[in-house]
Amino acid sequence: MEKLAEKISDSELEVMRVLWEADAPLPISDIRVALQQRKGWEPTTTKTLVQRLCNKQALAQEKRNVFYYRPLISQEEYQAWATNDLIHRLYRGSARNLVAALVHSDKLSNDDLQELRDYFKVEDEP
């Protein structure tokens, strides 16, 4: 997972998102339509990205009447890897420093902060 996730580009991640959201294998035509609507991508761009992800073993290809594609990595697995990678690369392995940066940023509302406080209180209780 670690080496694979490092190789998934931002554009390839968009393909993965389409498949994660679908929660079912999709033909290339459905993937193309979704990415054309979201990103304005040409069909050849989507086809290239899907092929790359298959080569990286991030997607499986299944022959029916046409090829269907499904992710071999769950969104949760990828998010866990990406979060861990972020913590190690930017915060020298300190999750505390990541949380501190979020708390001091303007990205969290007061409601978000209260929800986090409540979350940590529940986690601390036996």
Model-assigned labels for residue ranges:
Residues V33-W41:
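Short helix-coil junctions and helix-kink-helix linkers
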